[in-house]
Every structure is written in C-alpha cells, then in structure tokens.
C-alpha cells in the first residue's frame, strides 16, 4: 500500500504564527465548497465629491452640531463618541482574582483622509497619501508623549462596521498595552533574546527570498500574505529594514509607503471590482520609555471577502471555540492578488 504524500495545497494542516504565538488551521480542500449563506450588499453608486448630509465633509455640521472647517488637507478632530476619556479615575483595587479592573485613560480621534467624499485611499494620489502619513506621524509624536500606545487604524466599508462613508481613519491613544499588541511585544522580545535579531526583520528577508507570498514590492516596502494568515486575503505590510515606528521613517521611506499603500489598496479593489472592505492598522514600538529594539513597524490588513464582492468569511463556531481556520492557502491568495493590475478598475 503506497503512502500518501502530504500536499499543502490539498491536505489540511496547521501553520504557526510566531508573532502572537498561535496556530491557524488551513483546509485547502474546502475552497470549492458551495455557498448558500449570507451575501453582502454591493453598492457601486457614484458618490459625490461633497455630500451635504455627511457629518465629515468640509463645512458640514457634525452630529454634535459643531461645524467642520473648510479643510483641504487631511483633517483631524476629537471623536464625538470617544471610546476612551482623558480624565478617567482609577477604579478601586479588588482582592478577588476573578473580578479585576484596571484604569483605562486615553483619547480617540478621527482623521478624514481628504475633503473628497468619493475618494478612498486607492483613489487618492500618492502625494495625497503622503499628506495622510505626515498627519499620522504628527499624531504619534503628540500622543506618544502622554500615552504608551497609539493605535492608527481604518475600518473601510459597512461590512467592517464603518459608520460613515466619508473615507476616514481613527487614532486611539491609551494608557495601557492592548491584548494583541502585548502578545506581539512578548513574542518579539522572546525572539530577540533568543536569536539576537528582530523577528519581523528576519521574516521579511525570508519572504523576499521565497517570493511566493509577495503581493506588492517597492524600493523600501513589501506586502505579503503572511504564512500564517487567517483572513482569506489578509496582508502584512513591512519595511525592508529595521524601523521601530512611523515617526522614524526617512523621507524616502515615507514617500515609498504612500506608493505601496496605493498599490496594495488598488489591488484589493481590483480583486472583485468593488470598494474592498477591510480593517487595517499599524503596530509599532510602544512609547513606554524602553529602547524596544525587538520591535519592527508593520501594518495588518484584515479583509473579510472570500469568494466574491458579496461572500465574506465569518469567524464563528470552531474559530471562536477552537482556533482560526482558513480555506485558501496563503500562497494561493498571494498569487491571485499579485496578478492583479496596479491601475484601479475605475481609472482604466
């Protein structure tokens, strides 16, 4: 009786994520299963450059009644429904190990990427994205003086819970290290102490050599579908050399970041020729007074779409109770994204 040879594109297997010390189940044989479940609504109506009913457009009133300025560049303001407050008092300490609280202070801000209501990141020019990056850097410098963690992120599309269609991101600063970041901190620190090198710097060099998971590459940056990806078309955006924070980028690296953000976001939109939903955000060294040499700047992109513009992946059942699972292999997803044009389908 002949022994079956393992084939990663056919056989179930687990892949290890060294960044958060967790495993993901890969089930490539399920990729062709029929789908009769929920489908997302797709709206391709042409948005105006200015919507008089939008709370975020220039000159309009926000939901609080406060007017927006007639802004022409990226615009930052305090979130009208902040998840964190600056003056939160500390709770009383509990002696009961099962009922613990800790103080949570912080600030929540919104950044409108541009005054144009119709232009998401891939539809902005690289120069316009550079302006967004400059604002990110300014916010990090300011908030990093008061808080140990500053989270820059974007929820794009209604499928990701975005409550306003005007292209915007958020900036949350807090007095504590969030769970996901704390896991990354421990893993990167342990790797650095064991190997004397930076985990994600070593990882990016190996991905550059292997090439099979690369989606987009520029002079200073590379976007890959990580070996351990959970979401179908998840990507990890990395600088090619050691950089701890966005504020430490050279001018050339910052300009090139704008280029690769536009290219990556364009490929996402081109995949199903729709405004591709995702949650994305940057992780970088905390502002905790340590040297943090073990940290490497990176950005996660978590898009939910799986088979088409209307079929998304759900994190339910086994994934909530056991561990994350995916059907497409990371290599298959990267191949599909890599083959797509870097010219947006609306601009051809």
Report the location of each language-model feature.
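Active-site microenvironments that recognize anionic phosphate/pyrophosphate groups
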Residues: 1-166, 172-244, 252, 266, ...
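A contiguous, surface-exposed recognition patch within enzymatic or periplasmic domains that forms
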Residues: 244-253, 257-262
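Acidic/histidine-rich, metal-coordinating catalytic segments
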Residues: 280-284
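Extended C-terminal subregions enriched in glycine
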Residues: 256-275, 279
């Amino acid at each position: 009786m002949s022994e079956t040879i393992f084939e990663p594109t056919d056989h179930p297997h687990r892949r290890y994520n060294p960044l958060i010390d967790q495993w993901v189940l890969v089930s490539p044989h399920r990729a062709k299963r029929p789908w009769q479940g929920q489908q997302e609504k797709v709206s391709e109506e042409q948005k105006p450059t200015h919507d008089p009913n939008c709370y975020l457009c220039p000159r309009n009133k926000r939901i609080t009644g406060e007017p927006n300025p007639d802004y022409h560049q990226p615009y930052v303001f305090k979130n009208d429904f902040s998840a964190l407050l600056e003056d939160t008092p500390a709770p009383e300490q509990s002696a009961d190990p099962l009922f613990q609280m800790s103080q949570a202070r912080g600030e929540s801000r919104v950044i409108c990427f541009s005054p144009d209501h119709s232009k998401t990141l891939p539809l902005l020019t690289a120069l316009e994205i550079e302006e967004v990056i400059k604002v990110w850097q300014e916010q990090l410098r300011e908030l990093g003086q008061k808080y140990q963690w500053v989270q820059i992120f974007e929820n794009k599309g209604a499928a990701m819970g975005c409550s306003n269609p005007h292209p915007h991101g958020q900036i949350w600063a807090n007095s504590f290290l969030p769970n996901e970041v704390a896991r990354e901190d421990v893993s990167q620190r342990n790797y650095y102490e064991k190997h004397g090198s930076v985990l994600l710097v070593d990882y990016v060099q190996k991905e550059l050599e292997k090439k099979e998971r690369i989606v987009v590459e520029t002079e200073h940056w590379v976007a890959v579908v990580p070996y351990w990806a959970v979401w179908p078309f998840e990507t990890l955006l990395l600088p090619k050399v050691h950089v701890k924070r966005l504020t430490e980028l050279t001018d050339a690296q910052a300009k090139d970041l704008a280029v690769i953000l536009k290219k990556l976001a364009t490929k996402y939109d081109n995949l199903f020729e729709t405004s591709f939903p995702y949650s994305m955000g940057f992780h970088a060294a905390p502002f905790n007074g340590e040297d943090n040499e073990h940290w490497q700047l990176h950005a996660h992109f978590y898009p939910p779409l799986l088979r088409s513009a209307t079929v998304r992946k759900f994190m339910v059942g086994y994934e909530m109770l056991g561990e994350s699972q995916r059907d497409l292999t990371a290599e298959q997803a990267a191949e599909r994204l890599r083959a797509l044009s870097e010219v947006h389908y609306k601009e051809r």
